[in-house]
């Protein structure tokens, strides 16, 4: 059980395996096959990504990096990342994972935490801490000298991230607010086994092949322009002809089959 444990659940709260139990409690062990265990793996993978970004792009500012359905993401204040950048980041992440850095949790009083992140020149982390109540103990995680503001929980070491892939990058706004800073979001996914990752990536590729956006462009049915926006397709004569045929077919069905 110790080999597959990712975290613990103490009285309903998911915690690190390093958590000291100093009183009677209800304890459950969370493994990599559990949904919560997969979240912990992916959360740790996001921290590994952030560490890799800071190594290869020292001027990048870190913001937030949660586990999400099917994977994780991390937002950075930096210029857009290319596919080559993502490949280089993957290689750096593999180094970090192989090095097996321990993820060590520590806390600081709120004012010390603000000063700590100011000294590291991480303004987004400072903003997050400043919104927390006075007197709050602020938790951080250190892995090989990379430190991130985080409530956790995390794996014991970076070696626990066994199978991952950076899937894409896109633009995002800080706090999801278009009036705030533009950020670059890197998406990734992680699984406990390489076979699970391979199966997931094959499903992604299959979905891309059947993507109506991709197929419609390749068939010359529509296009988009940045001035109008990517969410509003402009149909070509060929695409317009197809729509008219579909409309007539539906009208015939309504009249002949459905009676209205």
Stretches with model-predicted labels:
Residues 11-17:
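Short alpha-helix capping/helix-loop boundary micro-motifs
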Residues 69:
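NTP-dependent nucleotidyl-transfer catalytic core
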Residues 4, 19-40, 61-65, 73-260:
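Auxiliary tRNA-acceptor-end handling modules of aminoacyl-tRNA synthetases
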Residues 51, 55:
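Metal-associated gating/positioning segment near the N- to mid-region
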